[in-house]
UniProtKB/Swiss-Prot annotation:
Its main location: membrane. One of its GO terms (cellular component) is plasma membrane. CDD domains: F1-ATPase_delta. Belongs to the ATPase epsilon chain family. It comes from Gluconacetobacter diazotrophicus (strain ATCC 49037 / DSM 5601 / CCUG 37298 / CIP 103539 / LMG 7603 / PAl5). This is ATP synthase epsilon chain. The gene is atpC. Produces ATP from ADP in the presence of a proton gradient across the membrane. InterPro entries: ATP_synth_F1_dsu/esu (IPR001469), ATP_synth_F1_dsu/esu_N (IPR020546), ATPsynth_dsu/esu_N (IPR036771).
Amino acid sequence: MMPIKVEIVSPEKVLFSRAVDMALIPGLEGDIAAMPDHAPMMLLLRGGVVELHQDGAVTDRFFVAGGFADMTETSCTILADQATALSDLSVEAAQARLAELEASYDKADKMNVPVLDLLMAKMQSARAEIEAAGGPAVQGA
């Protein structure tokens, strides 16, 4: 099988740039596999783990906090709001971020739907980060 060129880019830097057999990506509506000859598409991302596969094994894992992916027949570029290697995640930092977001949600104007939606998306991402870092699964409100 021909490889697919994958790039994972955060606002700070390029975290990954290499050809792999497949990238499993956390899409907003479910996970999707980016593989060679995939139909071109743009994909909104939810907070979750990107798994990179080579020779039948997972070689690299990154947490993305959202963003989007641009998939073509030969490449996949992931532009993440935040991206971190799984080995660099901290359960405690993600739990603290979730607590801050929950406090902000509690104080937010319940009539301001765009702000509430943004806070809900960030809380979902923080919950996914806690789980990706090896912490307990956290149920959302």
